[in-house]
Amino acid sequence: MAKYNIAISLGCTNTRILKTGVGVVLNEPTLLLLDLNSKKNPVLAVGDDIKNIHNKTTSMQCVSPVKNGNIVNKEYAKIMLNKFLEKVGEKKFFRGSLLWLTPTSLSENDKNEYVNLGYSLGYKNVSILPSAVAGFQELEIDMDNRHAHMLVDIGGGCTDVSVVVRGKVLQGCTAGIGGRDVDSSIVNLLNDAFETKISLEKAKEIKESVNTILPNDQLGCNVMIVDEFGAGSELAISARELRDVYLTFFMKVCNCITSVINMCPNEIVADINKTGIYLCGGLANFTGLDKFIRSKIGIPVYAVERPEFTSMFGCEKLFNEPEKLSHLVTLNS
């Protein structure tokens, strides 16, 4: 039975690292900054360190080695993760057992990519556990009972919908929709409605500041914009103006949930109707989201606390129960 000393969640937008006995030690963007003019050493910085690179040029480009939960560039993923691991004190020649927290619907080939990447990082033992299974440990739901539970993880790059029964993923899907799509829609909205161009990063700030879909919410924010002559001014954006963008996105999430429910046997659907749907991920903290999804699907919906770290905190609890963790890994392999 492997005793894991580290867990990694390689997300589309953020990478998180958990160390046993310590907790979450890293939460940084899943990004590398490349110098396109350099062939030998194109990687200039990774994660948060990219912000420290000033005077960026057109020959520099940010890339992510992950798309929809899948590793699309193993070499860049290895470079980025080695730098992250060194940052948290994981020396190359003293790496023990690694646990990947992954999306639900990975193919066998995708799983092998994660395992092989783990070995290439120098770990002696590498295993995989669906993030949803770890997440339910944080929610302190008794997974030994025979009832099915649903977890919806709305992340930055994808949305993971999972049905878990007695610690095993029974049904699920990973859809390529996430917070980045909302950011792009905000950029388009400001361009169309106000003839104002903003960056995706600025759109993300707006989304995080005005995170409500309640119809009468007075929440809003001011956006500093610069015109073509370099003059700055403030533009006020209200929740009402953003609401259609948000509802369009969350309706797609509802469609994902419905499609997974439709794939389940009647007795599983009956369970979910009783146990409800749990929301986690970065976009789960939108005010009114639980009520919106319930109104569309007709099933109780629960927003969890600290939704961005649900699977990480659940995994931390499992690190303290190695036999249970080993059982869950085997059950979902």
Positions of predicted regions on the chain:
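Nucleotide/phosphate-binding catalytic cleft detector across ATP-hydrolyzing
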Residues: 1-29, 33-151, 164-277, 284-311, ...
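C-terminal, charged low-complexity interaction regions
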Residues: 155-156
